[in-house]
Structure formats: C-alpha cells, structure tokens
Amino acid sequence: MKKVLALVVAAAMGLSSAAFAAETATPAKTAAPAKTTQTTQHHKKQHKKTVEQKAQAAKKHQKKDGKKAPAKSTSKTTSQPAA
C-alpha cells in the first residue's frame, strides 16, 4: 500500500514539474506590458516655529517662581485651644 502511495505522489510531482518546465521554457507570446508613467510626489515643507513661538513654549513649561505646591500633611494635629 505504501509503495502505491509513493508511486502516486512521485507521478504527481513529476507531472507538476514537467508542466512547470514547459511553462517556463516557452517564450512569452503576450504583448509587452503598457509603459507606466512615473509621478513624482511633492512633499510640503514643514513649517518651522519662529523664535517667539519657541520662547513662548519654553515659558509655558517653566515652573512658576520655582516654588513647589505645599505638601499635604497626613497627620492630623489639633492646635485649637480647648474652650
């Protein structure tokens, strides 16, 4: 049974390789493909920021007066005098 299967597979591969060889051996009889025209893409120039815009952006990201927000205390202290 295995020999029969091997022969069938070999025959199928032989036929496919023969068909492939015949296909590649014959010269192409179709007309030459149409000539394609190349189009060039124009890229837009990037807009560069002016010096004033850069300065404004730098000011925006600076910390105000170098002060940090006061830290929240987690402990509860009662400094009110008893009445």
Swiss-Prot record:
Required for growth and/or survival at acidic conditions. Residues 22-83 are annotated as: Disordered. Keywords: Periplasm, Signal. Residues 1-21 form the signal peptide. Residues 22-40, 71-83 have a biased composition (Low complexity). The keyword Signal applies. Residues 22-56 form a propeptide. Residues 57-70 have a biased composition (Basic residues). It holds the Pfam family Asr. This is Acid shock protein. Belongs to the Asr family. Its main location: periplasm. It is found in: Periplasm. The lineage of its organism: Bacteria, Pseudomonadati, Pseudomonadota, Gammaproteobacteria, Enterobacterales. The gene is asr. Proteolytic processing gives rise to the active protein. GO terms for cellular component: periplasmic space.
